[in-house]
Amino acid sequence: DEEGIAISLDDGSVVSTKLLAAADGAQSKVRELCGLQLREWDYGHHAIVTTVTTEKNHNFTARQRFLPDGPLAFLPLQTESGDCHQCSIVWSQQEDVAESLMSLDDAAFCTALEQAGSSSLGKIISVDKRYKIPLKQRHAVDYVVPGVALMGDAAHTIHPLAGQGVNLGFQDVIALVEEVERAVNRGLSPGDMSTLQRYQRRRKPHNLGTMAVMEGFKRLFEDQSLPVRLLRNDGMSAVNRLGPIKNLVIRQAMGLL
């Protein structure tokens, strides 16, 4: 209503607000309660996610290998003590292969991970608890209803092969904050539909475009035919050599363009 919305919590308390910014993940309860429809595409892959300790220092460098069954990413972490031998891994695999990897004991899993990662960080010393997450592309038909705006994975999820999901979420937050500030400065409610529609118009086309590009990359790296592999390798090498183009790609991925 004109006074905003009321949110009933599990403990029985009620919170009133002019705007609910819903960033409650891919299985968003807020999205469900608001009746916002979702388009979904199952990749038929699962991501194995865990934290590992490696023999070699990661030097704050993210590494990703595009394997025939799916990409494997090592994302650098730093402990409170400053140790630089831990990485978060995201290993995308077909469902049956992922299940087999999950069934391995820690030692066998570390060996399989070393082989898949080409031992770029030396031996895998230890592995934490593993999680298997189904990979799906999701996109809300609408991000907003009066008083509510979806952000991040609540609005869209994409394949993790380029790590763009979190960047898209950050860009959603920036856009919503800017539109809310603009509305408040004009004397409007932050949950006003005109404000939220401006947010949606800013973010939806960009998110859809990024999702399409990531789907193209996924298909490109899945194709193991010789002509495509040669073209792919030559193209990646060319981008890496051409500084201005490389910087343009990086800035686009970071949402700075």
Write out the residue ranges for each language-model feature.
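Conserved FAD/dinucleotide-binding core of flavoprotein oxidoreductases
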Residues: 67-134
